[in-house]
Structure formats: C-alpha cells, structure tokens
C-alpha cells in the first residue's frame, strides 16, 4: 500500500534543505545521507547522493528514471557470496 497523496512523498528535511541549497548555488558535490527511506524527487536529478548501507556510503547518481523510488533501493545492504558447492558429490 502506498503513501497517501494528501501527505506527499517522504524526504528527510536535512536532505531536502541540502539539495535546495545546492540547486540555488548551482553546485553538485556529493551529498552524504543516512536516510534510505527518502523518496527521490525531480529536483535531485543530476546530484550524487552517498547513501549509507550499514557499513559505508554508496554513491548513487540520480537519473530521471529513479524519480519516485527510495534512495535505499540503490544501495544494497547485503552481499551475495554465492551458494557453496555440494560436498557429497566427490564420493
């Protein structure tokens, strides 16, 4: 179930302020954030946002196709090492 239209999309206030300030200045440095639940808005297109995955900040370059998705979708938290080979096969 999605979020109510009357409420609007969730974006962390600190992240929103940083993006608006950089858009006004015309700068595009990397923005560091821990807010994985923030929705990507059209004003964020072209910015690189470093999203925390629990261990490190993963740089995410925001494109037009990402608008409406959450920042956490683009910073995976788990690394898949692969399945182990069957140990019984050698008998």
Swiss-Prot record:
Top-level taxon in the UniProt lineage: Bacteria
Entry annotated with the keyword Ligase: no
A GO molecular-function descriptor: structural constituent of ribosome
Function (record text): Protein S19 forms a complex with S13 that binds strongly to the 16S ribosomal RNA.
Organism: Synechococcus sp. (strain RCC307)
GO (cellular component) term, any one: cytoplasm
PANTHER family tied to this protein: RIBOSOMAL PROTEIN S19P FAMILY MEMBER, SMALL RIBOSOMAL SUBUNIT PROTEIN US19M
Pfam families for this protein: Ribosomal_S19
Family under the similarity heading: Belongs to the universal ribosomal protein uS19 family.
Annotated HAMAP family: Ribosomal_uS19
GO terms for biological process, alphabetical: ribosomal small subunit assembly; translation
The protein, known as: Small ribosomal subunit protein uS19
Keywords: Ribonucleoprotein, Ribosomal protein, RNA-binding, rRNA-binding
